[in-house]
């Protein structure tokens, strides 16, 4: 069973869903122009029965409100501020953080900034600094949409399909989430990155003492998997980058059983 609600923060009204598992808290953070429903196949699994899984819609996404101050919120750093505000408002003092794509960059900031971060897991996310951007990502047509302010329905469909995976049937809410996202956040997020407002993900990966799991699809269309293995990590879980053969940008949706088995082992180990 899961329950949903809304929490007021200085970054807007945050929509969330959580399971009734009695184990430690696990915070899930979705990607660019997506929504918390992306993690449904984890919430409905045995993991959701054993752990308190919490997913929220980033400001300007899903059922959350748009940010009242877009310049303060619509960046990786600002989304991390919003996540911390949400956790504080909910009275959550410790959590494992699981981030996908943009959410993975937010998870890295939490790893560095929020004392309650027990461990972090990133998927579809290169732990990159500003100087790494040209090599951390693969060139693709959809990368051009990442920072575009407004989507046509065709562009929203393309963005949602690329996120879900080639050949993966799109759920209606995936397209709706891409259409709903506050388009102001995309160029503002790019501007913040250019201005150096976000923390250096590569530096975080190399210095954070908490366990960091790095998991990627073997057919990842956006992230350069060779870059992932070139990064120096201080505490890389399992001592390696996990590559899930044949899967794309959202392996947790595309092949939930395979993904969940790995996530379950990670959670069991880092919360002992």
Q: Where are these predicted regions, by residue range?
A:
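Alpha/beta-hydrolase fold catalytic core
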Residues: 1-28, 48-51, 92-93, 240, ...
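Active-site loop/oxyanion-hole signature of alpha/beta-hydrolase fold enzymes
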Residues: 10, 54-98, 261
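Conserved HGGG/HGGXW glycine-rich cap/lid loop of the alpha/beta-hydrolase fold
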Residues: 12-66
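Conserved alpha/beta-hydrolase "nucleophile elbow" surrounding the catalytic nucleophile
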Residues: 30-32, 95, 99-104
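Short N-terminal helix/helix-N-cap motif within the alpha/beta-hydrolase-1
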Residues: 36-41, 63-66, 105, 223-224, ...
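Conserved loop-alpha-helix segment in the C-terminal half of the alpha/beta-hydrolase fold
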Residues: 46, 209-247, 253, 258
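Flexible "cap/lid" loop of the alpha/beta hydrolase fold
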Residues: 105-108, 112-150
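Conserved alpha/beta-hydrolase catalytic His-Asp/Glu region
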Residues: 132-133, 149-207
């Amino acid at each position: 069973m899961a329950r949903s609600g809304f929490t007021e923060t200085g970054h807007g009204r945050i929509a969330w869903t959580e399971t009734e598992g009695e184990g430690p808290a696990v915070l899930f953070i979705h990607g660019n122009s997506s929504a918390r429903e992306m993690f449904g196949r984890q919430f409905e699994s045995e993991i959701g029965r054993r752990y308190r899984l919490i997913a929220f819609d980033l400001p300007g996404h899903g059922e959350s409100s748009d940010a009242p101050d877009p310049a303060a919120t619509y960046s990786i750093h600002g989304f991390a501020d919003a996540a911390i505000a949400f956790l504080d408002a909910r009275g959550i003092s410790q959590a494992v953080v699981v981030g996908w794509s943009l959410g993975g960059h937010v998870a890295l900031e939490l790893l560095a900034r929020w004392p309650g971060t027990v461990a972090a897991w990133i998927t579809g996310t290169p732990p990159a600094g500003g100087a790494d951007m040209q090599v951390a990502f693969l060139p693709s047509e959809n990368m051009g949409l990442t920072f575009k302010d407004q989507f046509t329905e065709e562009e929203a469909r393309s963005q949602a399909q690329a996120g879900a995976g080639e050949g993966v049937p799109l759920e209606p809410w995936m397209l709706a989430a891409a259409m709903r996202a506050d388009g102001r956040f995309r160029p503002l997020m790019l501007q913040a990155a250019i201005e150096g407002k976000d923390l250096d993900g590569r530096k975080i990966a190399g210095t954070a003492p908490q366990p960091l799991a790095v998991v990627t699809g073997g057919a990842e269309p956006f992230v350069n998997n060779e870059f992932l293995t070139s990064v120096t990590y201080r505490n890389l879980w399992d001592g390696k980058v996990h590559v899930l053969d044949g899967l794309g940008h959202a392996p947790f949706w595309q092949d939930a059983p395979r993904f969940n088995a790995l996530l379950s082992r990670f959670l069991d180990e880092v919360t002992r």
